[in-house]
Amino acid sequence: MIIEKRELEQLPERGEIIIDADGHIAGRLATYVAKALLERPSLRIVVVNAEKLVITGDRKMVIEWFKRKISEWRTHYNPEKAGPKIPRRPDRVFKRIVRGMLPKKNMRGRSALKRLRVYMSIPLEMLNRKKLVLYEVPLAKLKVKPLAKFVTLEEVWRNIDFAAWEQWKRAQEIWQKRIKQVTGG
């Protein structure tokens, strides 16, 4: 995996860039992605390792917020409520965060969102391509601060929808074996 560090001003005008989201704070990375999509109409952005994105805040508070939002969906007791659906999977959560930063009611925002792809882990066809790190916010820096509290999107997903997370984890193990076979490692 080749990692290249760049700032937002140094991004190419067209083509496709792959951003490794490992250890990034979800909101900060989303602002960079949204701004790049709006400023460069011929640039496609692919974000990989979405499950390793970080949400800052107390672990229990963040998980309870997601659980509360999901429980506000239509229920047996309140069948009339059909409010906004909150995604559970980390890739969809990040895409939803970016969508909130784009002007989705006009054509520019909708086309920008169509040019964004978000994946959990790294797809096989993108293994040997250059990954881009926009800025340095590793988990180690978050752990150094004594009051810094954070939770990864994978942990949130595990606490919200354990069955789906467990199924993904099993598929991930099979995927890792396949990658080793393909790369010869």
Curated annotation (Swiss-Prot):
<dbReference type="InterPro" id="IPR005822">
    <property type="entry name" value="Ribosomal_uL13"/>
</dbReference>
<dbReference type="GO" id="GO:0022625">
    <property type="term" value="C:cytosolic large ribosomal subunit"/>
</dbReference>
<comment type="function">
    <text>This protein is one of the early assembly proteins of the 50S ribosomal subunit, although it is not seen to bind rRNA by itself. It is important during the early stages of 50S assembly.</text>
</comment>
<protein>
    <recommendedName>
        <fullName>Large ribosomal subunit protein uL13</fullName>
    </recommendedName>
</protein>
<dbReference type="InterPro" id="IPR023563">
    <property type="entry name" value="Ribosomal_uL13_CS"/>
</dbReference>
<dbReference type="GO" id="GO:0017148">
    <property type="term" value="P:negative regulation of translation"/>
</dbReference>
<dbReference type="InterPro" id="IPR005755">
    <property type="entry name" value="Ribosomal_uL13_euk/arc"/>
</dbReference>
<dbReference type="GO" id="GO:0006412">
    <property type="term" value="P:translation"/>
</dbReference>
<keyword id="KW-0689">Ribosomal protein</keyword>
<keyword id="KW-0687">Ribonucleoprotein</keyword>
<dbReference type="GO" id="GO:0003729">
    <property type="term" value="F:mRNA binding"/>
</dbReference>
<dbReference type="Pfam" id="PF00572">
    <property type="entry name" value="Ribosomal_L13"/>
</dbReference>
<comment type="similarity">
    <text>Belongs to the universal ribosomal protein uL13 family.</text>
</comment>
<dbReference type="GO" id="GO:0003735">
    <property type="term" value="F:structural constituent of ribosome"/>
</dbReference>
<dbReference type="InterPro" id="IPR005823">
    <property type="entry name" value="Ribosomal_uL13_bac-type"/>
</dbReference>
<comment type="subunit">
    <text>Part of the 50S ribosomal subunit.</text>
</comment>
<dbReference type="InterPro" id="IPR036899">
    <property type="entry name" value="Ribosomal_uL13_sf"/>
</dbReference>
